[in-house]
Each structure stands twice: as structure tokens, then as C-alpha cells.
A protein has these predicted regions:
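Mobile active-site "lid"/loop adjacent to the S-adenosyl-L-methionine
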Residues: 165-195
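S-adenosyl-L-methionine
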Residues: 129-166
Length: 270
């Protein structure tokens, strides 16, 4: 390898090894481009012994195969743990659409919670392939299916066909990673929420979130409200949540509060 492991993780591994923790190996993913902005080197590779980087985990009673080496970030988004659990009460018997499903986490939680049918959508072939594997791993392949499509293209097609869902979930990637692109991000969030609301049955539910700290809570809330007015929907807020507590919010750092997660009941204006 051309670059050494990050000093922090390398030192932790060394100390744990010296203390008899018997950690045989670590796969480090300090490869985010943002490290360069901070003058930090990027590193991706093993510390200690090598091992199979396709691992199985369990969260909320749902099992997943996780690709630590080549998956997005570290292969799984742990910050949504309790938000995934929050949808369980809505899902029994429901027809569910999960947009930007990644490796199927929200879709699989919906299936485990008793949804009648779940369709997960993602533009990544690798993500959809893993999501299908995860459905089989949990015995959900008969009720939870996945398609590899661009969500912005698929939702208007579903609307044109007259499709309706009891519950639509939006978990998109960050539409903005800088202040300079907030304006375009607002358009993206407004459009995707507008399209999703059109697919929700009268009295059905929408879960929607943003993982960009540049899209603050006030602006995100305003954008969702604009989308609802544009399609003549009234929103009843069921829940507002943020990231899991192992991703703590630091009051001295606004950027640490980055994840916003809403559940709404969507009602047609009469």
C-alpha cells in the first residue's frame, strides 16, 4: 500500500492488541474525499490480518450482508437504525414503496413488520443485487422486491399508471454537500417529495429524510411544506427524528445535526 493507515485507528488497533483484546484485523475506510480538504491522507485497506470483507450483521431483527470494502461509506448506514424501527407500526398489511433503497434496509424492515408488499428502488445495480440477497437472507423475497431504476424517472411513470401506495419512503443521498448548491438541492427535495405525495393514498403515510447538514431543519421543513401545497395535500406530522445516538449532536458544531427524518400522514385537500 502507498499510504499508511490513519494514525488514530492504527493506534487504537495497536493498543487493543497490546491489551489482549485479540482483534485480529480491521478494514479501514478512511477514503472519503473530504479528508483532502482537511489535509488528511486517504487510506483504504487492512490493518492486521486480512479477512472476508463481506460480513453479515443483524439490526432490529433484520439480517444483512454488508460489503465493507466496496459498499457506500462503510457498507451500511447505522445512523438510521431507530428510524428504520420507527416505520414498523405503519407497515402491517401495507403496500410500501421504498425509494433510494441502497441495500434494502427500510424495505426489509417494512417486510419484517408485516407489509403486504414492498417495492425497493435504487439506481445502483450493486445495491439492488445486495438488497435482493438480503431479502432472501430474511425469507422475504416473496413480498419484498427490488428494481434498478432512477427514482426521479420511475415515480412519474408510476403516477401515470395510477399506482397508489399506503406508505412511501424517501431516503435519498445528500443533494447538496456545499452551501453553493443549496438552491438546486431545494429543487430536488421539493420535486422528489412532490412526486412521492402524489403516489400516497389519501390518509396514507410518507417518510422523508435529508442527510445533508447544509439542508437545515427549517429549510427542509419549508421545502416539504411547499411540495405538499403544490399537490394540494395536507400533512399531519407523526414523528420527527434525527440520527441514532451513536452519532451524537455537538452543540458547538451545527454540522453534527445533519439527519432529519419525518413521518407524515398525507391527506387530500377537500
Amino acid at each position: 500500500r502507498d499510504v499508511a493507515p490513519s494514525r488514530g485507528l492504527g493506534d487504537v488497533y495497536k493498543r487493543q492488541d497490546e491489551n489482549g483484546m485479540n482483534i485480529r484485523g480491521v478494514y479501514e475506510r478512511s477514503d472519503a474525499k473530504v479528508r483532502l480538504n482537511e489535509g488528511l491522507e486517504r487510506f483504504k485497506g487492512f490493518i492486521g490480518e486480512e479477512f472476508d470483507t463481506k460480513v453479515m450483521i443483524e439490526e432490529n431483527g433484520v439480517k444483512y450482508y454488508v460489503d465493507v470494502q466496496d459498499g457506500q461509506k462503510t457498507g451500511f448506514f447505522l445512523d438510521q437504525k431507530y428510524n428504520r424501527k420507527a416505520i414498523w407500526k405503519i407497515c402491517p398489511g401495507a403496500k410500501v414503496l421504498d425509494c433510494f433503497t441502497h441495500t434494502g434496509s427500510f424495505a426489509l424492515n417494512a417486510g419484517m413488520a408485516g407489509a403486504a408488499s414492498v417495492l425497493g428502488v435504487d439506481a445502483s445495480e450493486l445495491g439492488v443485487e445486495q438488497a435482493r440477497e438480503n431479502a432472501k437472507l430474511n425469507g422475504l423475497e416473496d413480498r419484498v422486491s427490488f428494481v434498478c431504476r432512477d427514482v426521479f424517472e420511475l415515480l412519474p411513470e408510476l403516477e401515470k399508471k395510477g399506482e397508489k401506495f399506503d406508505f412511501v419512503i424517501l431516503d435519498p443521498p445528500a443533494f447538496t454537500k456545499s452551501r453553493s448548491s443549496i438552491k438546486n438541492a431545494v429543487k430536488g427535495y421539493r420535486e422528489i417529495n412532490l412526486r412521492a405525495m402524489k403516489l400516497v393514498k389519501d390518509g396514507g403515510y410518507l417518510a422523508t429524510c435529508s442527510c445533508s447538514h447544509f439542508m437545515d431543519t427549517e429549510l427542509f421543513t419549508k421545502t416539504i411544506g411547499e411540495a405538499a401545497r403544490n399537490v394540494h395535500k395536507r400533512l399531519r406530522q407523526i414523528e420527527f427524528r434525527t440520527q441514532a445516538p451513536d452519532h451524537p449532536v455537538l452543540w458547538a458544531s451545527d454540522s453534527s445535526l445533519y439527519l432529519k427524518f419525518y413521518i407524515f400522514q398525507v391527506v387530500d385537500e377537500k
